Amino acid sequence: MSGSTGERSFADIITSIRYWVIHSITIPSLFIAGWLFVSTGLAYDVFGSPRPNEYFTESRQGIPLITGRFDSLEQLDEFSRSF
C-alpha cells in the first residue's frame, strides 16, 4: 500500500516493463562478472588465498600438524621455514 509520499507499490514496480528491461540486463551481467572474477583467478589474487594447486608444494606434501605439547614452538618454526 502506498503512503502519502507518492511512492509506487512493489506490485506496480515489478509489473512494469521498464523494471524488466533494466533487470534483464543487470542481473545476467552481475552473474557473468562474478563468474569471470572467479574463473580467471583474480579472486585468488585480490583476497590472497592460495590457488588449489598451491596448497601442497613438491617439497611439502604433508599436513603441518603440531604433535608435541612441549616443543610446539620449535615445530612451528620448522613449518614456517618450509614455506
Curated annotation (Swiss-Prot):
Q: How is the protein disposed in the membrane?
A: Single-pass membrane protein
PROSITE patterns to which the protein is assigned, alphabetical: CYTOCHROME_B559
User: What InterPro entries does the record point to?
Assistant: PSII_cyt_b559_asu, PSII_cyt_b559_asu_sf, PSII_cyt_b559_CS, PSII_cyt_b559_N, PSII_cytb559_asu_lum
Q: Bound how, and how many: what does the cofactor note say? A: With its partner (PsbF) binds heme. PSII binds additional chlorophylls, carotenoids and specific lipids.
Q: Could you list the residue ranges that cross the membrane?
A: 21-35
Provide the alphabetized UniProt keywords: Chloroplast, Electron transport, Heme, Iron, Membrane, Metal-binding, Photosynthesis, Photosystem II, Plastid, Thylakoid, Transmembrane, Transmembrane helix, Transport
Instruction: Give the Gene Ontology MF terms in alphabetical order.
Output: electron transfer activity; heme binding; iron ion binding
GO biological process entries? photosynthetic electron transport chain
Q: Does the keyword Membrane apply?
A: yes
Note whether tRNA processing occurs among the keywords.
no
Q: Which cofactors does this gene product need?
A: heme b
One GO cellular-component annotation of the UniProt record comes to: chloroplast thylakoid membrane
Positions binding heme in this chain are: 23
Signal peptide (residue range): none
Where in or outside the cell it occurs: the entry states: Plastid, Chloroplast thylakoid membrane
Q: Which Pfam families match?
A: Cytochrom_B559 (PF00283), Cytochrom_B559a (PF00284)
Q: Which domain of life is it from?
A: Eukaryota
Q: How does it assemble?
A: Heterodimer of an alpha subunit and a beta subunit. PSII is composed of 1 copy each of membrane proteins PsbA, PsbB, PsbC, PsbD, PsbE, PsbF, PsbH, PsbI, PsbJ, PsbK, PsbL, PsbM, PsbT, PsbX, PsbY, PsbZ, Psb30/Ycf12, at least 3 peripheral proteins of the oxygen-evolving complex and a large number of cofactors. It forms dimeric complexes.
Q: Which family does it belong to?
A: Belongs to the PsbE/PsbF family.
Reported function: This b-type cytochrome is tightly associated with the reaction center of photosystem II (PSII). PSII is a light-driven water:plastoquinone oxidoreductase that uses light energy to abstract electrons from H(2)O, generating O(2) and a proton gradient subsequently used for ATP formation. It consists of a core antenna complex that captures photons, and an electron transfer chain that converts photonic excitation into a charge separation.
Q: What is this protein called?
A: Cytochrome b559 subunit alpha
Q: What is the native source organism of this protein?
A: Spinacia oleracea (Spinach)
